[in-house]
């Protein structure tokens, strides 16, 4: 804004002082009931938010652009700006306009960023991540300020894997790494901050002060110097943005306890969204029958980080088994957990003193259910008894809140009406005064009507004029002389009297005192609850786990899942396995397949570590491979699985290479994407991994493709030794089973019926002898003419007639102009040619060839 200070109003000077401090944010500047934006902020915001751009002081040559939004609907606008990667600084009026001399005092109370904002109704974690690479290791701090989680850990693996594991809303990076990390995290919101904020000693001190400990040894964090640097920088960033940072403590993440799923695997297995981008058709869509926000978070987190610890997995199996075996228990739990509030986030709001009366009341109602919840779990099984013992009955806290709050307290602390009658004697007195005063108003209205003879006279109130007497125009001649005119309307006049002003002062004074007192007492109440927050948080975690187990038990019971066996062996054995999502879509009538055909899998023994899977398109190869990967994944989150029997040897990582659509938009060819993804698998897979490869080599020429696919399978067999499902159209690859003992051929069975094929969807040992491509093309609806021509070409190929195929006569008529040399040769009468003529004709033909 190129306007001199002298030309600016006091308000705009105040705004510019604020903007100077928060140059990297869009400032929401509170003016009455609106947040206003000015200058460049207004230009940006108006485009993103789709609101009208106007200007301040339009009469001046250098008018200042501005736009505004109502403060009460700010959340949706803030969310849009954050989604675009902007920060939003909330600048509030902290002074009272009634008592302020001159301009009202304003101050930025909070800076919202993509990693620190909780949109309405979002149940998942809102992670902010800080990374610090140094000396071959990457230090990572991960926090969710809405649930109080704070993790530190280090890795020497690809940083992209860690980002994709947690999908943070915002990533903090040292400014010096901007160029080197830009591409790896291009699709995430990132903030580059000064390198000195990652200084180890400064970060260490910041962590000690924040968590109020003498040493980080108590958290087992001492040895993770890079993670400490990342953690200290993260806390400083939150502090600078005036965010509450009430964390439960530091937790060190041990990556060796979790299976790693990269973005490609999550996408190809459709874990969180289907390939069309919707939640329906994904694995979480099938498994999520959670009733609480805590349970929903637990399920999503565990799907992102499946377990490698067998005893933890078995513990979850035990819980699901207990719930599956007792329908009445499940029913009781559902009634208790239904509509349960997010008590983890409420507890954090209590710690940060940002809780409102309505939320506190919902906490009270939830805590009242804990004794019943404990009773339902008591003395059932070992796992349920441990959950019973993990829950705290906070009856003292329930009584404290119940004695204080009304049945339906307001969502805003300034509204009043927070406390019950009888809770505080001063509140009772002020309420009585307010009630009596309103009676006085009604009495005064009746008296004034009687005195003046104006039956339509009424006493009203608005925020601008306060209380007033309103008289319609036909009755103005009856107005007494002591009435003071205040406002003229189209059909009436408004007046005040000295008596009415005195009464108004009494009422307004009582209202103001009442609101101030209720605010003070509410803050006192919240402070008195602070000692209970750790137990509330603990209850939230336990209820989340119970809800998670209950959800998986409901799904297992409804869809006939079984408890898998799980061990450290390398064998995966599945009897009558089913694809959990496709089976569900068929049940709902959204896929018209009749019924899902189950299939077996045995992979891992020395003679069957790699399966080469052949068969026509549409026969079910991809479904089969995906379903087995999903069954492994489900087992390792502790879920029952869709099969008659399953034995799963722990998998450290699932790799998938299917499709390439995401990268085509980035200008990479299909084949290049195949090779990049395949290289990633070959470089990172271990003997404990489970690999799914679909049509490797299809993006190049046939011989190149076969050669690459062949060598990839050989490399996996001889070097990596991972359990692998390899689907291919290259039937030549089935010869590998004769060269390498660890490979077996399997195919999808089809039945031929004349020119038609029937997909039986069954997997059996052996290789496919045909691709059935023409039959599949017929099913897809290709024109008959094309199908007939394809059969003709196929017949010639099968006879190894690789010469140029004759073009159909109809095509010759339209397009073929003939070969002139061939035409000339056909005209020659050999019997009538003497040697001289023959040499001459040969010379002509040679010239024609030259010209051609």
UniProtKB/Swiss-Prot annotation:
Keywords annotated in UniProt: ATP-binding, DNA damage, DNA repair, DNA-binding, Nucleotide-binding
TM stretches of this protein: none
InterPro entries (alphabetical): DNA_mismatch_repair_MutS, DNA_mismatch_repair_MutS-lik_N, DNA_mismatch_repair_MutS/MSH, DNA_mismatch_repair_MutS_C, DNA_mismatch_repair_MutS_clamp, DNA_mismatch_repair_MutS_core, DNA_mismatch_repair_MutS_N, DNA_mismatch_repair_MutS_sf
Taxonomic lineage from the root: Bacteria, Pseudomonadati, Nitrospirota, Thermodesulfovibrionia, Thermodesulfovibrionales
SUPFAM superfamilies assigned to the protein according to its UniProt record, in alphabetical order: DNA repair protein MutS, domain I, DNA repair protein MutS, domain II, DNA repair protein MutS, domain III, P-loop containing nucleoside triphosphate hydrolases
PANTHER family (UniProt xref): DNA MISMATCH REPAIR PROTEIN MSH1, MITOCHONDRIAL, DNA MISMATCH REPAIR PROTEIN MUTS FAMILY MEMBER
GO-annotated cellular components: cytosol
The organism of origin for this protein: Thermodesulfovibrio yellowstonii (strain ATCC 51303 / DSM 11347 / YP87)
Residues that bind ATP: 615-622
Top-rank lineage group of the source organism: Bacteria
GO molecular function, one term: damaged DNA binding
Function: This protein is involved in the repair of mismatches in DNA. It is possible that it carries out the mismatch recognition step. This protein has a weak ATPase activity.
HAMAP family: MutS
Any single GO BP term: mismatch repair
Name of protein: DNA mismatch repair protein MutS
Record family assignment: Belongs to the DNA mismatch repair MutS family.
Record PROSITE patterns: DNA_MISMATCH_REPAIR_2
